[in-house]
UniProtKB/Swiss-Prot annotation:
Gene3D superfamilies noted in UniProt: Glutamine Phosphoribosylpyrophosphate, subunit 1, domain 1
Gene Ontology molecular function terms on file: endopeptidase activity; threonine-type endopeptidase activity
Quaternary structure note: The 26S proteasome consists of a 20S proteasome core and two 19S regulatory subunits. The 20S proteasome core is composed of 28 subunits that are arranged in four stacked rings, resulting in a barrel-shaped structure. The two end rings are each formed by seven alpha subunits, and the two central rings are each formed by seven beta subunits. The catalytic chamber with the active sites is on the inside of the barrel.
PANTHER family linked: METALLOPROTEASE TLDD, PROTEASOME SUBUNIT BETA TYPE-7
Source domain of life: Eukaryota
Keyword field: Cytoplasm, Hydrolase, Nucleus, Protease, Proteasome, Threonine protease
Purpose of the protein: The proteasome is a multicatalytic proteinase complex which is characterized by its ability to cleave peptides with Arg, Phe, Tyr, Leu, and Glu adjacent to the leaving group at neutral or slightly basic pH. The proteasome has an ATP-dependent proteolytic activity.
Taxonomic classification: Eukaryota, Amoebozoa, Evosea, Eumycetozoa, Dictyostelia
Subcellular location: Cytoplasm; Nucleus
The protein's name in its UniProt record: Proteasome subunit beta type-7
Residues the record marks as active site: 35 (nucleophile)
Transmembrane segments: none
Propeptide stretch(es), residue numbers: 1-34
UniProt-listed SUPFAM superfamilies: N-terminal nucleophile aminohydrolases (Ntn hydrolases) (SSF56235)
Length: 266
């Protein structure tokens, strides 16, 4: 009998999928998502930013969604990827950290949230479509982390993620400096998000900013609205005869009426 406990990766399912695809089965395609999320560390805290466009393929599903999620009183998280995955993942970790805080009686540390998120995403091997930027402040000071869908992480002074990340990173690389003030950090984050909005089709609408300081958190919802829609107060009214009639053809209308008697059975 064949030993089923052989080591290494088993390609049987891959071969099966190839056979099914050759017989005409349409395999599930890759889901393209779009977002621009950024974060930057300044002298006294952390500033997070995100756009507000949610898409369903080529369709704009929501023009003013929230992508900066609450984790703890001193920690927030930006999410890129599938909206349901980012919201569920952050809500789950937020509830676990609440229980952890009640158990320990101490302020939640950023590294605790980072560890919980990366362990959960690694366990699902990238099948949870959530690319996250975690920012917060604790006894170790302000910190900023990126968490990729497979569970890998980075800690940097400024980060970008999402389909508009390249445009946003170009702004950071050109204008970031050490020991920025809060006002400079907010302006830089807003410019980076705007760059993603105007250079990436998957990002759009408004700019959301969240400032995390030792004294508290400031949520600046719709901090900038670079794509504000304009509406006309009055409809277009054209005078009769404005458009010239080049050709006129009148055809007689003939109708044919057919009357049938239907005998009902007794």
């Amino acid at each position: 009998m064949e030993n089923l406990n052989r080591g290494g990766f088993d390609f049987d399912l891959c071969n099966r999928n190839n056979v099914l695809e050759k017989t005409g089965l349409r395999m599930k395609g890759f889901m393209k998502t779009g977002t621009t999320i950024v974060g930057v560390v300044y002298k006294g805290g952390v500033v997070l930013g995100a756009d507000t466009r949610a898409t369903e393929g080529p369709i704009v599903a929501d023009k003013n969604c929230e992508k900066i999620h609450y984790i703890a009183d001193n920690i927030y998280c930006c999410g890129a990827g599938t909206a349901a995955d980012t919201e569920s993942a952050t809500a789950l970790i937020s509830s676990k950290l609440k229980l952890h805080k009640l158990s320990t009686g101490k302020q939640t540390r950023v590294i605790t949230a980072l560890t919980m998120l990366k362990q959960m995403l690694f366990k699902y091997q990238g099948h949870i479509s959530a690319a996250l930027i975690l920012g917060g402040i604790d006894i170790n000071g302000p910190s900023l982390h990126t968490i990729y869908p497979h569970g890998s992480t980075d800690q940097l002074p400024y980060v970008t993620m999402g389909s508009g990340s390249l445009a946003a990173m170009a702004v950071f690389e050109a204008k970031y400096k050490n020991d920025m003030t809060k006002e400079e950090a907010i302006a830089l984050v807003a410019e980076a998000i705007s760059s993603g909005i105007f250079n990436d089709l998957g990002s759009g609408s408004n700019v959301d900013v969240t400032v995390i300081e030792p004294s508290g958190v400031t949520v600046l919802r719709n901090y900038q609205t670079p794509n504000e829609r304009k509406f006309r107060n009055n409809p277009y009214i054209f005078k009769q005869g404005t458009t010239p009639v080049l050709k006129q053809d009148i055809a007689p209308l003939s109708t044919k009426v057919v009357i049938e008697d239907i005998m009902m059975g007794q």
